[in-house]
Amino acid sequence: MEIRWLEGFIAVAEELHFSNAAIRLGMPQSPLSQLIRRLESELGQKLFDRSTRSVELTAAGRAFLPHARGIVASAAVAREAVNAAEGEIVGVVRIGFSGVLNYSTLPLLTSEVHKRLPNVELELVGQKLTREAVSLLRLGALDITLMGLPIEDPEIETRLISLEEFCVVLPKDHRLAGEDVVDLVDLAEDGFVTTPEFAGSVFRNSTFQLCAEAGFVPRISQQVNDPYMALLLVGAGVGVAITTHGTGLLAPPNTVHLPIKQHSVELRHGIAWMKGSGRVARDAVIDIALDIFKP
C-alpha cells in the first residue's frame, strides 16, 4: 500500500467524482482509476460503488476513509519534521474559503505564503460555508479555513482577522436604488437572496439579525450556496441581498450597493484550525496570517 494510493482514494472520496479528483491531483483519470483498483485489490474490499452517473463510498470505503486520512496526515507530519530539522519548511496546506467574502484576505495570505514559504504548496478549497468547513476541519480534510466568526466548537481554535460593515445590494432598477442610505424596514416586502439555513453561514445569520433589528423577518426568495451567485441573482431581479461592503464593490454592473441604516452588526472575518500540535507547514501559514492581519 502506497501513500499515493491513499491520496487518490481520499480525493475520490471527497469529490465523489473521478474526473474532478484527477484534476485536483493533477493526473489523468485513467491512472487514478487504476490506482483505486490496486488499493481495492490489496484491501480485498470494494471501496466505491460506481455507475455512469455517480460515485458513492461503500460501507468499507466509509470505514477506511478516516484511517486513510490519518496515515496520509502522519506521513506529511513525518516529512515536514525531517525538513524542519534541516531548517526547511515543506508541505501542502489545505485552506478552505467561502468565495467572494474572502475577496481581500485570501489573495493577501496566498501572496505572502508564496513569498515567505516558497516550498509550501497551498491547496485552496472554495465554496465551503461555515458548517461544512467546520466538518472538514474536524475530519482533517482541511488544515485551515477562512470563515465568519463566532464558531462554537471547543476543539477549534479561531482568531479574528478583520471586521467589515454590511451593505445592501439591489437591482439597478429597484425603487430604492437612488437612495444614499437604506433603512432595511423599507425592504420588508422584498424577497431576500441568501445562503441556505443548513449551511450555518454567518452571511445568512447576519441577514436575519439585521432584519430583526429593523423589525421584520426577511422573506427568502432564493437560497444559494455561493455568495457571489447571490449577487448575480439580485442583478437578475430575483431579490435583494445583504452582503459585506467590500463584496458589494464587486457586485455585477446591473446592481447597486448601498450602506444600511442598521449597522450594529459587522462581519467578523476569522481564521480557524484544529487545536493541538499541528504540522509544521500548517503552523507556519497560521503564523503568517496572524502577522499580516491586524483587526
From Swiss-Prot:
Keywords: Activator, DNA-binding, Transcription, Transcription regulation
Signal sequence annotation: none
Gene3D superfamilies: Periplasmic binding protein-like II (3.40.190.10), Winged helix-like DNA-binding domain superfamily/Winged helix DNA-binding domain (1.10.10.10)
Molecular-function GO term, any one: DNA-binding transcription factor activity
Pfam families documented for this protein: HTH_1, LysR_substrate
Stored SUPFAM superfamilies: Periplasmic binding protein-like II (SSF53850), Winged helix' DNA-binding domain (SSF46785)
InterPro entries in alphabetical order: LysR_subst-bd (IPR005119), Tscrpt_reg_HTH_LysR (IPR000847), WH-like_DNA-bd_sf (IPR036388), WH_DNA-bd_sf (IPR036390)
An annotated GO cellular component: protein-DNA complex
DNA-binding interval(s): 18-37
Entries under PROSITE patterns matching the protein: HTH_LYSR
Domain HTH lysR-type positions: 1-58
Family recorded in the similarity comment: Belongs to the LysR transcriptional regulatory family.
Role: Activates expression of the shikimate transporter ShiA in the presence of shikimate. Binds to the shiA promoter region.
Protein name (Swiss-Prot/TrEMBL): HTH-type transcriptional regulator ShiR
Native species: Corynebacterium glutamicum (strain R)
